[in-house]
């Protein structure tokens, strides 16, 4: 991932320098604005759905995304773009993993989430083919790349055993803010948008583009899963019983699904009481191997951040520039 971003940044710098050298003379009068809408698909890549790779996420949880976008052409192949969008992402261990693959341990973890993302993005768009004349003379098609900065607001939610959706951040499911636990995470975050696209000239003033952009975020909590399990009694004492329930979902499925229970028993043996000397109960006060046990791995401990992918179409309208009339003597 780091190598990909470095390579993209080098290409970006080279493209900007080329665009700048080509635009030194006379392009200012050809600058123009465009505005439009976008309709996209949105995918999540993280602890609950890592996908084959960050370039090829799983499509099982594809959700919608839509927004408005504006573009200002400043050089023959360079534009500044701003986009406001809304979309959803989703992940579920029970769907993204199964009994036969290497991710069976995520199946046992049995966590899930959904998240709504409100994003404001600014990026630099670099066209492969330059146009140093009026917008009407632009190429019929051109590939492009973009890189920028995004600010987004998110709110991961989980579904309770009763079917209600609750805000996971409010439940501090990994002991955020408690002694020995991680810091509270913010619902407001930054991301680095990087992507590629292809633009087609529909008419003199209309363009249709398709692009794919990865959002490399600075948080590992798009899914509310990042570190280790916290003490269940402490979660209950500070944030209520729902905090404990949403933190560890293994035994919930163990009780309801005989196939799941048999697989867990075969892998780890029967569940053990959460506190030594107590009986095993059917309400989650137990643990299986390290699942649910304080300090046991709950998320990716390698420090990898969550990301999301936005793929879709942009339809934009170009505002005509000023008409310059010839002077008569």
Show where each model-derived region lies.
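Outer-membrane beta-barrel "beta-signal"
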Residues: 121, 125, 304-329
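Extracellular loop and loop/strand-boundary signature of outer-membrane beta-barrel proteins
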Residues: 51-57, 105-113, 132-133, 178-184, ...
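Gram-negative (and chloroplast) outer-membrane scaffold detector with strong preference
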Residues: 76-78, 84-169
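Residues on the lipid-exposed face of transmembrane beta-strands in outer-membrane beta-barrel proteins
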Residues: 37-41, 68-72, 122-128, 147-151, ...
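Residues that define the transmembrane beta-barrel architecture of outer-membrane proteins
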Residues: 31, 62-64, 116-120, 141, ...
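Repeated loop/turn-to-beta-strand initiation elements of outer-membrane beta-barrel proteins
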Residues: 45, 77-80, 131-133, 205-208, ...
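Surface-exposed strand-loop-strand hairpins of Gram-negative outer-membrane beta-barrel proteins
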Residues: 41-69
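Flexible glycine-rich, low-complexity coil/linker segments exposed to the extracellular/periplasmic environment
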Residues: 173-178, 233-305
